[in-house]
């Protein structure tokens, strides 16, 4: 088994599926004879993200992951359908081909474009019950990477903070609130439970434009 250290200084990478470039990357990996690799990675994209933990390479094509991820106002996505700057902490555990992600995330700033994201949502006076089983996630992460294709998200809380918007041809609304998230990329199952408060914005209906100064989006999860 390999033994020793590998260091990356001043690296960069572009993630086409996320639409962001990571810069000023630093990485340190320490390889032990028993097949355990201790890693530390830091990357910048507006804010900063760091990864620490261990990777077991007993099975090279399916290493075992035990990682902690921290975001500090990190530009995690910048796509045509969704843009998000995140803070918070996640853990990534389990085999590479079926990892489990859990933790607490905060959306410091974000925008979701409804038509692009293909949401089947009927909003009436900004009071809605959303069936999250109807959300098409196929465009979020287009990749043949087995990690991304099979990732599961459990016991995860998403806190949406001010300066987070949902936008469509009829709607432009700032949101605030908290959701519990359960997502299985492999089966395309998504459950969101919680409420988002509409803080301000506008909504068009029947040929008229209405100003929004309150209301609630309720997410009820899967049936």
Language-model segments: what does each one mean?
Residues 4-223:
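Strand-loop-strand
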């Amino acid at each position: 088994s390999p033994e020793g250290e590998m260091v990356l200084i001043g690296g960069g990478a572009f993630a086409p599926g996320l639409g962001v470039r990571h810069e000023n990357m630093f990485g340190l990996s320490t390889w032990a004879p028993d097949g355990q690799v201790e890693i530390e990675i830091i990357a910048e994209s507006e804010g900063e993200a760091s990864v620490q933990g261990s990777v077991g390479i007993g099975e090279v094509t399916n290493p075992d992951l035990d990682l902690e991820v921290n975001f500090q106002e990190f530009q995690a996505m910048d796509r045509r359908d969704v843009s998000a700057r995140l803070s918070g902490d996640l853990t990534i555990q389990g085999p590479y081909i079926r990892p489990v992600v859990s933790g607490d995330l905060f959306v410091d700033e974000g925008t979701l474009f409804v038509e692009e994201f293909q949401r089947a949502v009927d909003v009436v006076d900004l009071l809605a019950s959303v069936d999250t089983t109807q959300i098409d996630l196929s465009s979020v992460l287009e990749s043949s990477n087995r990690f991304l294709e099979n990732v599961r998200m459990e016991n995860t809380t998403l806190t949406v903070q001010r300066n987070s918007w949902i936008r469509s041809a009829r709607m432009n609304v700032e949101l605030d609130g908290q959701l519990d998230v359960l997502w299985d990329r492999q089966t395309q199952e998504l459950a969101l439970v919680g409420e988002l408060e509409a803080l301000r914005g506008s909504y068009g209906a029947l040929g008229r434009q209405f100003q929004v100064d309150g209301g609630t989006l309720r997410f009820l999860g899967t049936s």
